[in-house]
C-alpha cells in the first residue's frame, strides 16, 4: 500500500516569526493552533494547496544548533513547495518584495531560507503549465 506524506514539522526558536513568514510571504493558511500551557501557541499547523498533508511549526525550547546548510551534508536537504510554472515570475517578485534573499535558482526551483535557516524551495517542472 503506498504511503502519503502526513506532515513536515519544523521546530522554531521564534514561532511567531516563522508563522508570519509562512503565512505572509508564502501564503499558507492556518489549519489549527495547539495551545501551550501558560499561554501562546505550542504548534501551528499550516495547509498546503492540495490539502494532502500540512506543515507543522513547533515551538522549540532551545536555540538551534549552528548548522549552516551545505549540499551533500547529511540531514534535511530542503522543504520543496510546488508552484505552477507560469507563476514563477510572480513568486520571484513576491520573495523580492518581502526581502527574502534567494540563494540559488535552477530551471525548476527557487531556493531560499526561512527565518530559522531551513532551506526552502519553490519548485515546478516544465510541463506544469
Model-inferred region functions:
Residues 34-41, 129:
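Short glycine/proline-centered loop/turn elements that form peptide/ligand docking sites
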Residues 1-5, 10-32, 48-101, 113-129:
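Glyoxalase I/VOC metalloenzyme domain signal
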Residues 43-45, 109-111:
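Conserved hydrophobic/aromatic beta-strand scaffold that supports enzyme active sites
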Residues 36-37, 109-110, 126:
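Conserved beta-strand edge residues that scaffold enzyme active sites
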Residues 105-107:
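Short, small/polar residue-rich loop motifs at catalytic or cofactor-binding pockets
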Amino acid at each position: 500500500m503506498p504511503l502519503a506524506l502526513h506532515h513536515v514539522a519544523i521546530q522554531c526558536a521564534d514561532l511567531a516569526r516563522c508563522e508570519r513568514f509562512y503565512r505572509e510571504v508564502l501564503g499558507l493558511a492556518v489549519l489549527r493552533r495547539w495551545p501551550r500551557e501558560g499561554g501562546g501557541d505550542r504548534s501551528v499547523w499550516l495547509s498546503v494547496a492540495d490539502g494532502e498533508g500540512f506543515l507543522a511549526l513547533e515551538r522549540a525550547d532551545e536555540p538551534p544548533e549552528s548548522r549552516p546548510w551545505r549540499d551533500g551534508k547529511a540531514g534535511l536537504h530542503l522543504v520543496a513547495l510546488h508552484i505552477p510554472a507560469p507563476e514563477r515570475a510572480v513568486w520571484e517578485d513576491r520573495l523580492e518584495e518581502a526581502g527574502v534573499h534567494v540563494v540559488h535558482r535552477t530551471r525548476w526551483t527557487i531556493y531560499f531560507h526561512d527565518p530559522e535557516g531551513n532551506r526552502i524551495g519553490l519548485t515546478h517542472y516544465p510541463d506544469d503549465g
